[in-house]
Amino acid sequence: VAGAGVVLLEPTNEEGILDALLLSNGTGKEFLNIEGGGSLYPASSQLLVDEKRYIKQDGKVVFKNAIQSMSDTCLNVLKRNDFTVENVNWLVPHQANKRIIDAVGNEINIEEGKTLVNIEHYGNTIAATIPLCMWENTSKLKKGDLLMLTAFGAGFSWGASLLRWTI
């Protein structure tokens, strides 16, 4: 599964990107990674035979860490900007797994119905999940809405961004 998303940024007098926090912990690489590719295992026909191009994960470990990391980071970003979850109009999480999406919403205590979800239509489109979900839900987004974006991925790496919708 792969995906691509593009977000067009334009100059504005309004503040759109309020904050972003990106974190990583390399000890998670054994639990979620793609061994092949990059400088260690450059693309080759042998890479295809060895199947090192596929994502490998320990689902239980990833599940637990994704929920905790995404939730903690969302709350951290909100706190350092003097917001609470009640101020958030929309949570836009990485669309990897519906159970993780629901658990993050529960963990940060966001009001039901304020989480944008589209995984049932496309599955996990990797790096495109958040832009695709925002695009699909553009009609719900109103000027001035506060959006909390959050994701978790290989390595482990995770983060959250706080945006003010300016369109």
Stretches with model-predicted labels:
Residues 67, 71, 89-167:
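Claisen-condensing/thiolase-fold acyl-transfer catalytic domains that form or cleave C-C bonds
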Residues 10, 75-76, 135-136:
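Short glycine/serine- and small hydrophobic-enriched flexible loop segments
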